Amino acid sequence: MARDKARDIAFVKLANVGLGPEVGALHPAELSGGMRKRVGLARAIATEPEIIFFDEPTTGLDPIMGDVINDLIVDCVRDLGATTLSITHDMASARKIADRVAMLYRGEIIWVGPVSEIDDSGNEYVDQFINGRAEGPIQMEVRAL
């Protein structure tokens, strides 16, 4: 692809995630956490893929910016007609961007279902995790210093 065409596509995708062309001239260290997430999303959609992978898309963001990123993910995915696979520990994010959820525990899938059914999964591991309780079948090891 010609450099000019790639730059034009980059500016369009940056605009899709609410960033102006001036962001393209900045170094990564000059971007805020939210801007970095937006640039990452623009990069992910640049080739208009059929499948997009997200790894902790809202990690390190305050709840408001996390919600902004979730909205952008939902909008971009809808506009592209893409399928996504997201890995997250952020239940607010999972509830907003997912249609279906799978929970893994110790490398095994222990529950799969529609996000609308996660609160009534009947799975004690899922229940403990989504409610953020220390007590339950998931035991966290704490090592002495």
Where are these regions (language model features)?
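A short, surface-exposed alpha-helical micro-motif characterized by mixed small hydrophobic
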Residues: 94-96
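Catalytic Walker B motif of ABC-type/P-loop ATPase nucleotide-binding domains
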Residues: 52-55
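Conserved ABC ATPase "signature" region
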Residues: 5-22
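Helical segment within the ABC ATPase nucleotide-binding domain
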Residues: 67-80
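Conserved catalytic motifs of ABC-family nucleotide-binding domains
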Residues: 48
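Conserved ABC ATPase signature
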Residues: 27-31, 35
